[in-house]
Amino acid sequence: MPNKVKINLEKVSRVFAGPSGERIEALRDVSLEVEEAYTPEGRDVGEFRVLLGPSGCGKSTILRLIAGLDFPDSGKVEVNGKTVEGPGRDRGMVFQKYTSFPWLNVADNIAYGLTIQGAPAAQKKETVAKLVEAVGLSGFEKSYPDRLSGGMQQRVAIARTLAVRPEVILMDEPFGALDAQTRGDMQALLLHIWDETACTVLFVTHDVEEAVYLADRIFILSARPGTIVEDVPVALGRPRDPAMKQTKEFHDLQDYVLACLRRAPGTGHVRVGV
């Protein structure tokens, strides 16, 4: 059974107006594909793809275009073979900034999308119960965001996204503001959830170690105007284990990705890891 193209961008460009009216070219002729594969048993398995590049290279803009929160000046953006015309239930997004509603507790934040969709109370209760356990927030259902750590707030954000069962999860540096230990815990949680749900993930980072550890393949972007300069396969086995970060295979791949970044036009600072 041939693989299915889940996300497709063809020659996408995006230009913004600067504060003084100057032309800021964020993306230029970006083309990429993210596929959905099939196991021998016929199960759909979404790819885990990473967008890696220096700050300001347009990674977040790509996610916003796929999410339907912004639109290209030229080119084509498709999900499941259909042109993206706005946000949809098939896509969910997790941001770096904490996005929990401060007036809602954990359970109600997780159920927010279902509430908007008019889901029955019984469905919301069952979904929240499963997700609270899945993301390790049991006992915090009635807590409010100001009582949660950064890692816990991102667990809420992931659970809220999963509650509406999207086919594609778009993640914009969701662990960038977390300390190293919490970031490692969240990476492990994300990989577990991805394995369980088999959804497609497109994850933005400027951390090379994080990219190599999480991804099936890595799209490497140049500095602004961002364009795809490399598509690097990550030939590491799954499930991933933190111990593999100490292996020669991992370090060789990390060095290769870093070299690709340094060869890319105009690239500056990227984080290698901690």
Residue ranges and their predicted role:
Residues 158:
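Hydrophobic anchor residue at the start of the ABC signature
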Residues 169-172:
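Catalytic Walker B motif of ABC-type/P-loop ATPase nucleotide-binding domains
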Residues 67:
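Helix-to-loop junction immediately C-terminal to a conserved catalytic motif
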Residues 143-146, 164:
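Conserved signature/switch motifs of ABC ATPase nucleotide-binding domains
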Residues 75-86:
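Conserved ABC transporter NBD signature motif
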Residues 111, 115, 120-140, 192:
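Conserved ABC ATPase "signature" region
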Residues 104-112:
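Short coil-to-helix segment of the ABC ATPase nucleotide-binding domain corresponding to the Q-loop/switch region
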Residues 87, 107, 133, 141-144:
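Signature (C-motif/LSGGQ) region and adjacent switch/coupling loops
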